[in-house]
Amino acid sequence: VTVRATDDANNTSTADASHSTLGSSLQLRVKERVAPVLAIIYPTASALITNNKPSITWTVTDDDSGVNPSTIGVTIDSGSKITGDSISKTAISGGYKCTYTPGTALADGSHTIKVDASDYDGNAASQKSVTFKIDTVPPTLSVTSPADGFVTNQAACNVQGTTNDLTSSPVSVTVKLNNGNAEAATVASNGSWSKTITLVEGTNTITVVATDSAGKSTTVTRTVKLDTKAPVIKSVTLTPNPVDTEKTVVISVEVTD
């Protein structure tokens, strides 16, 4: 803005933004209408995470009037909006990178976070939100067959049981025999699973691992013995021999297996 003053004697004075004392008062700023831009970095939408105190991270930028840091906020689920010093703000080009870590652990299950901010001209950014899941509990796993310590003469062994995870299903199950490779079991929609393996002669160690979608796992082991060799009768002794009628006779048998 330029101001010109002229008196009756036709003397003229001019003042504009370059004036040494009045310059700042002659600067007219027009408010901008472009809102800040928000972007959530972590967690991502539909993420499945095992940390129940996740570091929620997002950015807010505004290249015009600038981001007003006092308006930066985050809301978790239906809780109150969190603002102020609870949110860490690191200056970046045109705005801030923000981080908030909950002081109280979030429960397992689904959560929604919402972030918002405004610029110095009062333009509010379009709120951004993401929904994610937290899973800190490994899946349940039971092996119903075979029992630990089971002895059999059949090489084919059907390993079976049940598994479940309320937060991050489906659950995958693998079965490993001794030092062999872990092989996938068939898991039904109700959580029951089974896998047929071939035992080797002697003591076998069966390792079953259930892993949920969050990568948490539960392990159960069973020891099973395969014995296909019949016992050997090495000797039989009858004492006394011969024996009188209606008398007691002792039969001694030596057997190895």
Model-based region annotation:
Residues 46-52, 148-155, 241-247:
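Short, solvent-exposed loop/linker segments at the N-terminal edge
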Residues 7, 18-39, 128-139, 222-231:
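Flexible, low-complexity linkers/stalks enriched in Thr/Pro that connect modular domains
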Residues 96-100, 191-195:
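Short strand-edge motifs at loop-to-beta-strand transitions and within beta-strands
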Residues 103-110, 196-203:
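Surface-exposed, short loops/turns at beta-strand junctions within beta-sandwich domains
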Residues 62-76, 164-177, 257:
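Solvent-exposed loop/turn segments flanking beta-strands in beta-repeat/beta-sandwich domains
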Residues 56-62, 159-163, 251-257:
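Aromatic/hydrophobic beta-strand junction motif of beta-rich domains
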